[in-house]
From Swiss-Prot:
<keyword id="KW-0324">Glycolysis</keyword>
<keyword id="KW-0963">Cytoplasm</keyword>
<feature type="binding site">
    <location>
        <position position="302"/>
    </location>
    <ligand>
        <name>Mg(2+)</name>
    </ligand>
</feature>
<feature type="active site" description="Proton acceptor">
    <location>
        <position position="354"/>
    </location>
</feature>
<feature type="binding site">
    <location>
        <position position="251"/>
    </location>
    <ligand>
        <name>Mg(2+)</name>
    </ligand>
</feature>
<dbReference type="InterPro" id="IPR029017">
    <property type="entry name" value="Enolase-like_N"/>
</dbReference>
<feature type="binding site">
    <location>
        <position position="164"/>
    </location>
    <ligand>
        <name>substrate</name>
    </ligand>
</feature>
<keyword id="KW-0456">Lyase</keyword>
<feature type="binding site">
    <location>
        <position position="405"/>
    </location>
    <ligand>
        <name>substrate</name>
    </ligand>
</feature>
<keyword id="KW-0479">Metal-binding</keyword>
<feature type="binding site">
    <location>
        <position position="302"/>
    </location>
    <ligand>
        <name>substrate</name>
    </ligand>
</feature>
<dbReference type="InterPro" id="IPR020811">
    <property type="entry name" value="Enolase_N"/>
</dbReference>
<dbReference type="GO" id="GO:0000287">
    <property type="term" value="F:magnesium ion binding"/>
</dbReference>
<comment type="similarity">
    <text>Belongs to the enolase family.</text>
</comment>
<comment type="subunit">
    <text>Homodimer.</text>
</comment>
<keyword id="KW-0460">Magnesium</keyword>
<feature type="binding site">
    <location>
        <position position="329"/>
    </location>
    <ligand>
        <name>Mg(2+)</name>
    </ligand>
</feature>
Length: 446
Protein backbone atom coordinates (compact mmCIF):
# COMPACT_ATOMS: atom_id res chain seq x y z
CA UNK A 1 0.00 0.00 0.00
CA UNK A 2 1.56 3.29 -1.10
CA UNK A 3 1.83 6.03 1.50
CA UNK A 4 -0.71 8.83 1.21
CA UNK A 5 -1.10 12.32 2.63
CA UNK A 6 -2.94 12.26 5.97
CA UNK A 7 -2.88 15.90 6.95
CA UNK A 8 -1.49 19.27 5.88
CA UNK A 9 -1.00 22.01 8.47
CA UNK A 10 0.12 25.60 7.82
CA UNK A 11 1.26 28.27 10.25
CA UNK A 12 2.61 31.81 10.15
CA UNK A 13 6.33 32.06 10.97
CA UNK A 14 8.86 34.87 10.38
CA UNK A 15 11.47 35.40 7.71
CA UNK A 16 14.95 36.85 8.22
CA UNK A 17 13.61 40.40 8.01
CA UNK A 18 10.97 39.89 10.68
CA UNK A 19 8.14 39.67 8.16
CA UNK A 20 5.50 36.94 8.39
CA UNK A 21 5.72 34.01 5.97
CA UNK A 22 4.12 30.59 5.51
CA UNK A 23 5.35 27.26 6.84
CA UNK A 24 3.65 23.95 6.08
CA UNK A 25 3.84 20.51 7.69
CA UNK A 26 2.78 17.43 5.74
CA UNK A 27 2.03 14.15 7.55
CA UNK A 28 1.71 10.87 5.63
CA UNK A 29 0.10 7.51 6.38
CA UNK A 30 3.46 5.72 6.78
CA UNK A 31 4.59 8.17 9.47
CA UNK A 32 6.56 10.39 7.09
CA UNK A 33 6.69 14.02 8.15
CA UNK A 34 7.98 16.94 6.07
CA UNK A 35 8.15 20.69 6.69
CA UNK A 36 8.83 23.60 4.33
CA UNK A 37 8.80 27.39 4.57
CA UNK A 38 8.65 29.98 1.80
CA UNK A 39 10.80 33.11 1.42
CA UNK A 40 9.84 36.57 0.14
CA UNK A 41 11.64 39.22 -1.90
CA UNK A 42 12.24 42.97 -1.50
CA UNK A 43 12.74 43.91 -5.13
CA UNK A 44 9.84 41.94 -6.58
CA UNK A 45 9.08 41.76 -10.28
CA UNK A 46 5.61 42.94 -11.28
CA UNK A 47 5.03 39.69 -13.18
CA UNK A 48 5.61 37.41 -10.18
CA UNK A 49 2.77 35.14 -9.07
CA UNK A 50 0.69 36.65 -6.28
CA UNK A 51 2.17 36.59 -2.79
CA UNK A 52 -0.96 36.80 -0.65
CA UNK A 53 -0.71 39.26 2.26
CA UNK A 54 -3.46 40.27 4.67
CA UNK A 55 -3.27 44.06 4.44
CA UNK A 56 -4.62 46.10 7.36
CA UNK A 57 -2.51 47.28 10.28
CA UNK A 58 -1.28 44.01 11.81
CA UNK A 59 2.34 43.35 10.87
CA UNK A 60 2.14 46.54 8.76
CA UNK A 61 -0.15 44.74 6.33
CA UNK A 62 2.26 41.83 5.81
CA UNK A 63 0.45 39.14 7.77
CA UNK A 64 -0.18 35.82 5.99
CA UNK A 65 -3.20 34.50 7.90
CA UNK A 66 -5.24 34.40 4.67
CA UNK A 67 -2.61 32.22 2.96
CA UNK A 68 -2.32 30.02 6.07
CA UNK A 69 -6.09 29.67 6.18
CA UNK A 70 -6.16 28.77 2.47
CA UNK A 71 -3.80 25.86 3.19
CA UNK A 72 -5.65 24.72 6.31
CA UNK A 73 -9.18 24.97 4.94
CA UNK A 74 -8.89 24.58 1.14
CA UNK A 75 -5.64 22.95 -0.02
CA UNK A 76 -4.98 20.59 2.90
CA UNK A 77 -8.37 18.84 2.99
CA UNK A 78 -8.27 18.43 -0.81
CA UNK A 79 -4.90 16.63 -0.69
CA UNK A 80 -5.84 14.00 1.89
CA UNK A 81 -5.41 10.51 0.42
CA UNK A 82 -3.16 11.69 -2.42
CA UNK A 83 0.25 10.18 -3.21
CA UNK A 84 2.99 12.66 -2.19
CA UNK A 85 5.44 11.16 -4.70
CA UNK A 86 3.15 12.34 -7.54
CA UNK A 87 4.55 15.89 -7.49
CA UNK A 88 3.31 16.97 -10.92
CA UNK A 89 -0.23 15.78 -10.31
CA UNK A 90 -0.42 17.48 -6.92
CA UNK A 91 1.06 20.76 -8.19
CA UNK A 92 -1.24 20.85 -11.22
CA UNK A 93 -4.23 20.02 -9.04
CA UNK A 94 -3.46 22.92 -6.66
CA UNK A 95 -2.58 25.44 -9.37
CA UNK A 96 -5.15 24.62 -12.03
CA UNK A 97 -8.11 23.24 -10.10
CA UNK A 98 -8.03 24.50 -6.53
CA UNK A 99 -6.80 27.96 -7.51
CA UNK A 100 -7.53 28.18 -11.24
CA UNK A 101 -6.70 31.89 -11.73
CA UNK A 102 -4.94 32.87 -14.96
CA UNK A 103 -3.54 35.96 -16.63
CA UNK A 104 -1.72 36.49 -19.94
CA UNK A 105 1.43 34.88 -18.47
CA UNK A 106 -0.27 31.73 -17.19
CA UNK A 107 -1.44 30.46 -13.81
CA UNK A 108 -1.13 33.40 -11.41
CA UNK A 109 -2.30 31.96 -8.05
CA UNK A 110 -4.43 34.99 -7.23
CA UNK A 111 -7.09 33.08 -5.35
CA UNK A 112 -5.03 31.02 -2.90
CA UNK A 113 -1.66 32.82 -3.11
CA UNK A 114 1.65 31.56 -4.50
CA UNK A 115 3.02 31.52 -0.94
CA UNK A 116 0.28 29.10 0.17
CA UNK A 117 0.62 26.81 -2.87
CA UNK A 118 4.43 26.84 -2.87
CA UNK A 119 4.77 25.99 0.83
CA UNK A 120 2.64 22.89 0.22
CA UNK A 121 4.48 22.07 -3.03
CA UNK A 122 7.88 22.18 -1.27
CA UNK A 123 6.69 20.14 1.72
CA UNK A 124 5.10 17.53 -0.56
CA UNK A 125 8.37 17.28 -2.50
CA UNK A 126 10.31 16.64 0.72
CA UNK A 127 7.72 14.06 1.81
CA UNK A 128 7.98 12.32 -1.57
CA UNK A 129 11.75 11.99 -1.17
CA UNK A 130 11.36 10.55 2.35
CA UNK A 131 8.79 8.01 1.20
CA UNK A 132 11.09 6.90 -1.62
CA UNK A 133 13.95 6.81 0.90
CA UNK A 134 16.18 8.88 -1.34
CA UNK A 135 17.81 12.26 -0.74
CA UNK A 136 15.73 15.30 -1.73
CA UNK A 137 18.20 16.30 -4.47
CA UNK A 138 17.90 12.83 -6.04
CA UNK A 139 14.09 12.96 -5.91
CA UNK A 140 14.16 16.37 -7.65
CA UNK A 141 16.57 15.02 -10.29
CA UNK A 142 14.22 12.09 -10.92
CA UNK A 143 11.20 14.40 -11.24
CA UNK A 144 13.08 16.45 -13.85
CA UNK A 145 14.65 13.50 -15.68
CA UNK A 146 18.15 14.77 -14.89
CA UNK A 147 20.75 11.98 -14.93
CA UNK A 148 23.86 13.81 -13.72
CA UNK A 149 24.14 15.64 -10.41
CA UNK A 150 26.39 18.70 -10.23
CA UNK A 151 27.29 20.92 -7.28
CA UNK A 152 26.79 24.59 -8.11
CA UNK A 153 29.28 27.43 -8.11
CA UNK A 154 28.22 29.71 -5.24
CA UNK A 155 27.69 33.38 -6.13
CA UNK A 156 28.24 35.24 -2.87
CA UNK A 157 26.56 38.64 -2.68
CA UNK A 158 29.24 40.49 -0.72
CA UNK A 159 28.50 44.14 -1.50
CA UNK A 160 24.91 45.36 -1.32
CA UNK A 161 23.27 48.38 -2.88
CA UNK A 162 19.92 49.09 -4.52
CA UNK A 163 16.76 48.27 -2.57
CA UNK A 164 18.75 46.04 -0.22
CA UNK A 165 20.90 48.76 1.36
CA UNK A 166 20.82 52.22 2.86
CA UNK A 167 23.78 53.52 0.86
CA UNK A 168 23.71 55.54 -2.38
CA UNK A 169 24.70 52.61 -4.59
CA UNK A 170 22.18 52.09 -7.42
CA UNK A 171 23.16 48.55 -8.42
CA UNK A 172 21.86 45.94 -6.03
CA UNK A 173 24.41 43.13 -5.75
CA UNK A 174 28.12 42.65 -6.34
CA UNK A 175 28.98 38.97 -6.19
CA UNK A 176 32.05 36.75 -6.16
CA UNK A 177 32.06 33.33 -7.87
CA UNK A 178 34.90 30.87 -7.10
CA UNK A 179 34.89 29.24 -10.55
CA UNK A 180 38.52 28.15 -10.15
CA UNK A 181 37.82 25.88 -7.17
CA UNK A 182 38.05 22.10 -7.59
CA UNK A 183 35.15 21.29 -5.26
CA UNK A 184 32.28 23.02 -3.50
CA UNK A 185 34.21 22.72 -0.24
CA UNK A 186 37.13 24.60 -1.79
CA UNK A 187 34.74 27.17 -3.28
CA UNK A 188 33.46 27.88 0.23
CA UNK A 189 37.03 28.34 1.46
CA UNK A 190 37.78 30.82 -1.33
CA UNK A 191 34.54 32.70 -0.86
CA UNK A 192 34.91 32.98 2.89
CA UNK A 193 38.53 34.14 2.65
CA UNK A 194 37.70 36.81 0.07
CA UNK A 195 34.76 37.91 2.24
CA UNK A 196 37.00 38.42 5.27
CA UNK A 197 39.63 40.25 3.21
CA UNK A 198 36.87 42.46 1.80
CA UNK A 199 35.73 43.25 5.33
CA UNK A 200 39.17 44.49 6.32
CA UNK A 201 39.60 46.47 3.08
CA UNK A 202 36.24 48.21 3.65
CA UNK A 203 36.95 48.82 7.34
CA UNK A 204 40.29 50.43 6.55
CA UNK A 205 38.89 52.62 3.80
CA UNK A 206 35.45 53.57 5.13
CA UNK A 207 35.53 52.87 8.86
CA UNK A 208 34.00 50.27 11.16
CA UNK A 209 30.34 51.12 10.52
CA UNK A 210 30.78 50.39 6.81
CA UNK A 211 31.14 46.70 7.71
CA UNK A 212 27.58 46.42 9.00
CA UNK A 213 25.81 43.78 6.94
CA UNK A 214 22.66 44.03 4.82
CA UNK A 215 19.67 41.70 4.42
CA UNK A 216 21.77 39.10 2.58
CA UNK A 217 24.92 39.33 4.68
CA UNK A 218 26.90 41.58 2.35
CA UNK A 219 28.50 44.88 3.26
CA UNK A 220 26.91 48.20 2.36
CA UNK A 221 29.70 50.79 2.44
CA UNK A 222 28.53 54.31 1.67
CA UNK A 223 29.80 54.47 -1.87
CA UNK A 224 27.91 55.86 -4.81
CA UNK A 225 30.06 54.84 -7.76
CA UNK A 226 29.21 51.33 -8.92
CA UNK A 227 32.75 51.03 -10.22
CA UNK A 228 34.02 51.52 -6.68
CA UNK A 229 32.13 48.35 -5.69
CA UNK A 230 33.90 46.41 -8.44
CA UNK A 231 37.25 47.90 -7.40
CA UNK A 232 36.73 46.74 -3.80
CA UNK A 233 36.00 43.19 -5.00
CA UNK A 234 39.05 43.15 -7.25
CA UNK A 235 41.25 44.28 -4.35
CA UNK A 236 39.82 41.70 -1.92
CA UNK A 237 40.25 38.89 -4.48
CA UNK A 238 43.90 39.95 -4.99
CA UNK A 239 44.59 40.14 -1.26
CA UNK A 240 43.16 36.64 -0.79
CA UNK A 241 45.43 35.40 -3.59
CA UNK A 242 42.63 34.22 -5.88
CA UNK A 243 42.99 36.46 -8.93
CA UNK A 244 41.82 34.40 -11.93
CA UNK A 245 40.15 31.82 -9.69
CA UNK A 246 37.41 34.02 -8.23
CA UNK A 247 35.38 36.07 -10.70
CA UNK A 248 32.65 38.68 -10.42
CA UNK A 249 28.89 38.76 -10.97
CA UNK A 250 26.39 41.61 -10.66
CA UNK A 251 22.68 41.92 -10.05
CA UNK A 252 21.72 45.40 -11.14
CA UNK A 253 17.95 45.15 -10.47
CA UNK A 254 17.52 47.99 -12.96
CA UNK A 255 13.70 47.96 -12.74
CA UNK A 256 14.18 49.67 -9.38
CA UNK A 257 15.66 52.81 -10.98
CA UNK A 258 13.96 52.92 -14.36
CA UNK A 259 11.53 55.72 -15.17
CA UNK A 260 8.81 54.76 -17.61
CA UNK A 261 7.95 58.43 -18.08
CA UNK A 262 11.15 59.43 -19.87
CA UNK A 263 12.55 55.91 -20.44
CA UNK A 264 15.73 56.60 -18.49
CA UNK A 265 17.73 54.88 -15.78
CA UNK A 266 18.64 57.05 -12.79
CA UNK A 267 21.96 55.96 -11.26
CA UNK A 268 21.35 58.41 -8.41
CA UNK A 269 17.82 57.23 -7.60
CA UNK A 270 18.36 56.98 -3.86
CA UNK A 271 19.15 60.66 -3.49
CA UNK A 272 15.87 62.46 -2.87
CA UNK A 273 15.20 65.47 -5.11
CA UNK A 274 18.35 64.83 -7.13
CA UNK A 275 18.97 67.03 -10.17
CA UNK A 276 18.57 64.21 -12.69
CA UNK A 277 22.16 64.57 -13.87
CA UNK A 278 22.75 60.81 -13.60
CA UNK A 279 19.72 59.78 -15.66
CA UNK A 280 20.91 57.85 -18.69
CA UNK A 281 19.36 56.02 -21.64
CA UNK A 282 19.25 52.25 -22.06
CA UNK A 283 21.99 52.46 -24.68
CA UNK A 284 24.24 54.49 -22.38
CA UNK A 285 23.64 52.02 -19.57
CA UNK A 286 24.56 49.17 -21.92
CA UNK A 287 27.84 50.94 -22.61
CA UNK A 288 28.48 51.31 -18.87
CA UNK A 289 28.21 47.51 -18.57
CA UNK A 290 30.49 46.99 -21.54
CA UNK A 291 33.15 49.18 -19.95
CA UNK A 292 32.81 47.24 -16.66
CA UNK A 293 33.23 43.95 -18.52
CA UNK A 294 36.37 45.17 -20.27
CA UNK A 295 37.96 46.29 -16.99
CA UNK A 296 36.89 43.61 -14.49
CA UNK A 297 36.56 39.79 -14.53
CA UNK A 298 32.76 39.92 -14.79
CA UNK A 299 31.05 36.71 -15.91
CA UNK A 300 27.41 37.41 -15.08
CA UNK A 301 25.07 40.43 -15.14
CA UNK A 302 21.52 40.02 -13.87
CA UNK A 303 18.57 42.33 -14.59
CA UNK A 304 20.67 44.93 -16.46
CA UNK A 305 17.51 46.67 -17.69
CA UNK A 306 13.88 47.20 -16.72
CA UNK A 307 11.56 44.16 -16.69
CA UNK A 308 9.77 45.47 -19.80
CA UNK A 309 12.85 46.69 -21.68
CA UNK A 310 13.08 43.66 -23.97
CA UNK A 311 14.87 45.75 -26.62
CA UNK A 312 17.98 46.60 -24.60
CA UNK A 313 18.15 43.09 -23.14
CA UNK A 314 18.33 41.67 -26.66
CA UNK A 315 20.93 44.24 -27.78
CA UNK A 316 23.17 43.51 -24.83
CA UNK A 317 22.82 39.73 -25.20
CA UNK A 318 23.76 40.01 -28.85
CA UNK A 319 26.77 42.22 -28.13
CA UNK A 320 28.36 40.59 -25.07
CA UNK A 321 26.29 37.45 -24.39
CA UNK A 322 29.11 35.14 -25.49
CA UNK A 323 31.55 36.29 -22.82
CA UNK A 324 29.04 37.30 -20.15
CA UNK A 325 25.93 35.59 -18.91
CA UNK A 326 22.90 37.90 -19.14
CA UNK A 327 20.48 36.74 -16.45
CA UNK A 328 16.75 37.44 -16.47
CA UNK A 329 15.13 37.74 -13.05
CA UNK A 330 12.42 40.44 -13.00
CA UNK A 331 12.29 39.95 -16.78
CA UNK A 332 11.42 36.24 -16.54
CA UNK A 333 10.12 35.70 -12.98
CA UNK A 334 10.74 31.94 -13.43
CA UNK A 335 7.61 31.93 -15.62
CA UNK A 336 7.64 29.36 -18.46
CA UNK A 337 5.59 31.68 -20.73
CA UNK A 338 8.01 34.58 -20.26
CA UNK A 339 10.99 32.24 -20.62
CA UNK A 340 9.58 31.06 -23.98
CA UNK A 341 9.22 34.67 -25.15
CA UNK A 342 12.79 35.51 -24.09
CA UNK A 343 14.16 32.43 -25.86
CA UNK A 344 12.33 33.40 -29.04
CA UNK A 345 13.47 37.02 -28.90
CA UNK A 346 17.00 36.16 -27.69
CA UNK A 347 16.50 38.62 -24.84
CA UNK A 348 18.92 37.03 -22.38
CA UNK A 349 20.82 33.78 -22.00
CA UNK A 350 20.28 32.67 -18.41
CA UNK A 351 17.39 32.08 -16.02
CA UNK A 352 17.34 33.12 -12.39
CA UNK A 353 15.41 30.34 -10.67
CA UNK A 354 13.28 31.57 -7.76
CA UNK A 355 10.62 29.04 -6.80
CA UNK A 356 8.47 31.65 -5.08
CA UNK A 357 8.16 33.78 -8.22
CA UNK A 358 6.15 31.09 -9.95
CA UNK A 359 4.80 29.19 -6.94
CA UNK A 360 5.28 25.45 -7.54
CA UNK A 361 8.06 22.90 -7.90
CA UNK A 362 6.63 21.56 -11.18
CA UNK A 363 6.49 24.92 -12.94
CA UNK A 364 10.01 25.71 -11.69
CA UNK A 365 11.33 22.47 -13.20
CA UNK A 366 9.57 23.31 -16.47
CA UNK A 367 11.22 26.76 -16.63
CA UNK A 368 14.65 25.20 -15.98
CA UNK A 369 14.24 22.49 -18.62
CA UNK A 370 13.17 25.05 -21.23
CA UNK A 371 16.13 27.25 -20.38
CA UNK A 372 18.64 24.42 -20.58
CA UNK A 373 17.25 23.21 -23.90
CA UNK A 374 17.75 26.72 -25.28
CA UNK A 375 21.42 26.55 -24.28
CA UNK A 376 20.95 28.96 -21.40
CA UNK A 377 22.60 29.01 -18.01
CA UNK A 378 20.49 28.70 -14.84
CA UNK A 379 21.21 30.23 -11.43
CA UNK A 380 19.23 29.01 -8.42
CA UNK A 381 18.40 31.85 -6.05
CA UNK A 382 17.24 32.69 -2.54
CA UNK A 383 15.16 35.79 -1.73
CA UNK A 384 16.21 38.68 0.48
CA UNK A 385 13.65 37.62 3.12
CA UNK A 386 14.73 34.02 3.80
CA UNK A 387 14.07 31.26 6.32
CA UNK A 388 16.22 28.41 7.63
CA UNK A 389 14.68 26.11 4.98
CA UNK A 390 17.37 24.56 2.74
CA UNK A 391 15.21 23.29 -0.15
CA UNK A 392 17.00 25.41 -2.77
CA UNK A 393 20.36 23.73 -2.01
CA UNK A 394 18.91 20.35 -2.99
CA UNK A 395 17.11 21.99 -5.92
CA UNK A 396 20.38 23.38 -7.32
CA UNK A 397 22.04 19.95 -7.19
CA UNK A 398 18.99 17.99 -8.37
CA UNK A 399 18.50 20.21 -11.42
CA UNK A 400 22.27 20.66 -11.95
CA UNK A 401 21.78 24.39 -12.38
CA UNK A 402 25.53 24.92 -12.01
CA UNK A 403 25.12 28.11 -9.98
CA UNK A 404 23.45 29.24 -6.77
CA UNK A 405 23.19 32.62 -5.14
CA UNK A 406 22.08 32.59 -1.56
CA UNK A 407 23.84 35.57 -0.01
CA UNK A 408 27.20 36.24 1.56
CA UNK A 409 28.85 33.63 3.81
CA UNK A 410 27.22 35.43 6.75
CA UNK A 411 23.82 35.19 8.56
CA UNK A 412 22.49 31.75 9.41
CA UNK A 413 19.60 31.77 6.94
CA UNK A 414 22.19 32.14 4.14
CA UNK A 415 24.76 29.67 5.54
CA UNK A 416 21.98 27.10 6.02
CA UNK A 417 21.92 26.60 2.24
CA UNK A 418 25.72 26.59 1.78
CA UNK A 419 26.12 24.15 4.69
CA UNK A 420 23.52 21.84 3.14
CA UNK A 421 25.54 21.89 -0.10
CA UNK A 422 28.66 20.88 1.86
CA UNK A 423 26.70 17.93 3.30
CA UNK A 424 25.44 16.92 -0.14
CA UNK A 425 28.95 17.02 -1.62
CA UNK A 426 30.21 14.87 1.26
CA UNK A 427 27.32 12.41 0.80
CA UNK A 428 27.98 12.08 -2.94
CA UNK A 429 31.63 11.33 -2.18
CA UNK A 430 33.63 10.16 -5.18
CA UNK A 431 30.82 10.88 -7.65
CA UNK A 432 30.53 14.54 -6.58
CA UNK A 433 31.14 16.93 -9.49
CA UNK A 434 31.65 20.68 -9.00
CA UNK A 435 30.49 22.88 -11.88
CA UNK A 436 33.52 25.20 -11.76
CA UNK A 437 34.31 26.93 -15.04
CA UNK A 438 31.42 25.05 -16.72
CA UNK A 439 28.83 26.82 -14.55
CA UNK A 440 26.87 28.04 -17.59
CA UNK A 441 26.41 24.55 -19.06
CA UNK A 442 27.33 21.92 -16.46
CA UNK A 443 25.26 19.11 -18.02
CA UNK A 444 23.65 18.25 -21.33
CA UNK A 445 20.04 19.49 -21.48
CA UNK A 446 17.59 16.95 -20.06
Amino acid sequence: MAATIQSVKARQIFDSRGNPTVEVDVFCSDGTFARAAVPSGASTGVYEALELRDGGSYYLGKGVSKAVNNVNSVIGPALIGKDPTAQTEIDNFMVQQLDGTKNEWGWCKQKLGANAILAVSLAVCKAGASIKRIPLYQHIANLAGNKQLVLPVPAFNVINGGSHAGNKLAMQEFMILPTGAASFKEAMKMGVEVYHHLKSVIKKKYGQDATNVGDEGGFAPNIQENKEGLELLKTAIEKAGYTGKVVIGMDVAASEFYSDKDQTYDLNFKEENNDGSQKISGDSLKNVYKSFVSEYPIVSIEDPFDQDDWVHYAKMTEEIGEQVQIVGDDLLVTNPTRVAKAIKEKSCNALLLKVNQIGSVTESIEAVKMSKRAGWGVMTSHRSGETEDTFIADLAVGLSTGQIKTGAPCRSERLAKYNQLLRIEEELGAIAVYAGAKFRAPVEPY
